[in-house]
From Swiss-Prot:
Gene that specifies this protein: deoC
Protein name: Deoxyribose-phosphate aldolase
Signal peptide range in chain numbering: none
Residue intervals passing through the bilayer: none
Alphabetical list of Pfam families matching this protein: DeoC
Length: 220
């Protein structure tokens, strides 16, 4: 198992200075991680820093609340892609999901999907705020719209990825769609548990700890 290729090496904290973003980029190059996951303000910089590597640039849209309008999410995604993003992790309209307004959840995802072109779209459903039935419905909609992945969490809400949720999401979307576990994966043992449950990508700030067989204290 090339576990490095499961890892989106992540820094999304509001107070992360350029030096920390550079550290994440350098570590991603060293360990040949699948991507760095960074806030949109750093996309242009990361794209330049990673242009001679295989590491992708991943960014977040409508993050972390998912409460922006669909039009704004689409603009944000388009702008990120123009700046060099290879992968887009968008947050669903969580309030719409809790209101059972599934048409709005669908059109919101579709608005971003329409501008992604050949880039990857991951849909964050924020599992800690949804019932199992809502998780299933959100995953079904993301798949129907044409997203490439469903993703558990922002890492900024009440909880992160769990084995239960990853299994449920995998069962819902079937074998061909990506499932990203993010938030609360701190070490190699936890990473393997998520992969065994069906995750094909891991959103972690603990990428180096996972590779070194250590445990990180970071929440994401």
């Amino acid at each position: 198992m090339q576990i490095n290729k499961y890892i989106d090496h992540t820094i999304l904290k509001a107070d992360a200075p350029k030096s920390k973003v550079q550290q994440i980029i350098d570590e991603a190059k060293k360990y040949d991680f699948m991507s760095v996951c960074i806030n949109p303000t750093w996309v242009s910089y990361a794209s330049q820093e990673l242009k001679d590597s295989d590491v992708k640039v991943c960014t977040v849209i409508g993050f972390p609340l998912g409460a922006n309008t669909s039009e704004l999410k689409a603009f944000e995604a388009k702008n990120a892609i123009e700046n060099g993003a290879d992968e887009i992790d968008m947050v669903i309209n969580i309030g719409a999901a809790k209101s059972k307004d599934w048409n709005l959840v669908e059109s919101d995802i579709a608005a971003v999907n329409a501008v992604k072109g050949d880039k990857l779209l991951k849909v964050i459903i924020e599992t800690s705020l949804l019932t199992d039935d809502e998780k299933i419905k959100a995953c079904q909609i993301a798949k129907a719209v044409g997203a490439d992945f469903v993703k558990t969490s922002t890492g900024f809400s009440t909880g992160g990825a769990t084995v239960h949720d990853v299994k449920l999401m995998r069962q819902t979307v079937g074998p061909d769609m990506g499932v990203k576990a993010s938030g609360g994966v701190h070490n190699l043992e936890e990473a393997k548990a998520m992969i065994d449950a069906g995750a094909t990508r891991l959103g972690v700030s603990a990428g180096v700890a996972i590779m070194e067989g250590l445990t990180s204290n970071d929440n994401y």
